[in-house]
């Protein structure tokens, strides 16, 4: 089984204020995108010019202004500053308001968003992953059962009921940057999320084989798992803009350890601004030729990544949406 190509738009919540971002999302639906995803940050990647609107409030506004696109998080961490029962309630409400259009993308989190609101020490991966598994289990119980009594290592409910919930549970997409969580996505995720630009071997040797392994372990058809990849694409007919638009997002080019451990946007910005442009641009597909873009994206679709969500780094998002629809969408849908 293989799923059809879907084209999505990444609403850059760390770059734009919530009103701008809603309007860009409405425009994305108008320009033919199939989905819109948003990250859920308490703090942005950079202090200067950064934004961090609350994803849950924002999704409600977007749901009311759109009628067709799938909407969801990429990603939200339901484990520290949130109680997963509250996230279950929130997404059940979204599911009632926008049936069939909502998904919850989850990950193990970043210190940047948790320590600012009181988490004293950033836990090791083992605890973060255990919390994620437990939170997903609890949320699914709350979406399908009543009077849930849950006694986990980290979370507990007593006769808990989500009173307003859709007839079908909210799809949970699991974000992974390594084999351990990717195997979990294959076992338990309705969808899988990863990001582009991290070296071919990560996808061919680690992530996708791990998703397959996890699915095989529980007798699932991995081909039926919606495999979403956030593609970092700086496309513009003007080559100078295509390159220099990536500068705002230089923090994405920091090491995984830096991104997971730094807790201050000012520190993140200082570390990122010290990076050379060549290193910043390496995380992105930087191009002015649409055929070059399609050829590079074909690498991912050939691996079975079917849900292509495009993150454009420039400040002129309407320009990106227009040139994407004109130059890229028809070519990508034919892959």
UniProtKB/Swiss-Prot annotation:
Its EC number is 1.1.98.2. Pfam families: Bac_luciferase. Homodimer. It is an enzyme of class 1 (oxidoreductase). Keywords: Carbohydrate metabolism, Oxidoreductase. InterPro entries: F420-dep_G6P_DH, F420-G6PD/mer, F420_G6P_DH-rel, Luciferase-like_dom, Luciferase-like_sf. The active site is at 41 (proton donor), 110 (proton acceptor). It catalyses: oxidized coenzyme F420-(gamma-L-Glu)(n) + D-glucose 6-phosphate + H(+) = 6-phospho-D-glucono-1,5-lactone + reduced coenzyme F420-(gamma-L-Glu)(n). Coenzyme F420-(gamma-Glu)n binds at residues 40, 77, 108-109, 113, 177-178, 180-181. Belongs to the F420-dependent glucose-6-phosphate dehydrogenase family. Substrate binds at residues 195, 198, 259, 283. This is F420-dependent glucose-6-phosphate dehydrogenase. GO terms for biological process: carbohydrate metabolic process. GO terms for molecular function: coenzyme F420 binding; glucose-6-phosphate dehydrogenase (coenzyme F420) activity; oxidoreductase activity, acting on paired donors, with incorporation or reduction of molecular oxygen. It comes from Segniliparus rotundus (strain ATCC BAA-972 / CDC 1076 / CIP 108378 / DSM 44985 / JCM 13578).
């Amino acid at each position: 089984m293989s799923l059809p190509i879907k084209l999505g738009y990444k609403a850059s919540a760390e770059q734009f204020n919530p009103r701008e971002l809603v309007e860009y999302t409405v425009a994305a639906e108008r320009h033919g995108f199939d989905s819109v995803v948003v990250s859920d940050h308490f703090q942005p990647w950079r202090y200067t010019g950064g934004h961090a609107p609350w994803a849950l409030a924002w999704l409600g506004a977007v749901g009311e202004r759109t009628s067709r696109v799938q909407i969801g998080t990429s990603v939200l961490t339901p484990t520290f500053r949130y109680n997963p029962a509250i996230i279950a309630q929130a997404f059940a409400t979204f599911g009632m308001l926008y049936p069939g259009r909502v998904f919850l993308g989850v990950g193990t989190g970043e210190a940047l968003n948790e320590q600012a609101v009181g988490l004293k020490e950033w836990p090791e991966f083992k605890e973060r992953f255990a919390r994620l598994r437990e939170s997903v289990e609890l949320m699914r119980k709350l979406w399908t059962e009543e009077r849930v009594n849950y006694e986990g290592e980290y979370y507990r409910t007593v006769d808990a009921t989500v009173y307003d919930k859709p007839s079908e549970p909210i799809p949970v997409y699991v974000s992974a940057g390594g084999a351990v969580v990717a195997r979990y996505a294959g076992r338990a995720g309705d969808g899988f999320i990863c990001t582009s630009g991290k070296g071919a071997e990560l996808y061919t040797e680690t992530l996708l084989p791990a998703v397959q392994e996890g699915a095989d372990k529980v007798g699932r058809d991995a081909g039926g798992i919606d495999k979403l990849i956030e593609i970092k694409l700086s496309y513009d007919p003007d080559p100078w803009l295509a390159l220099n638009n990536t500068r705002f997002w230089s923090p994405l080019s920091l090491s995984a350890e830096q991104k997971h451990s730094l807790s201050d946007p000012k520190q993140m910005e200082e570390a990122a601004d010290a990076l050379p442009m060549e290193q910043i641009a390496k995380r992105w597909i930087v191009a002015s030729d649409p055929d070059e873009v399609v050829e590079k994206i074909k690498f991912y679709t050939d691996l079975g990544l079917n849900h292509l969500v495009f993150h454009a780094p420039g400040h002129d998002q309407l320009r990106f949406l227009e040139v994407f629809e004109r130059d890229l969408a028809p070519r990508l849908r034919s892959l």
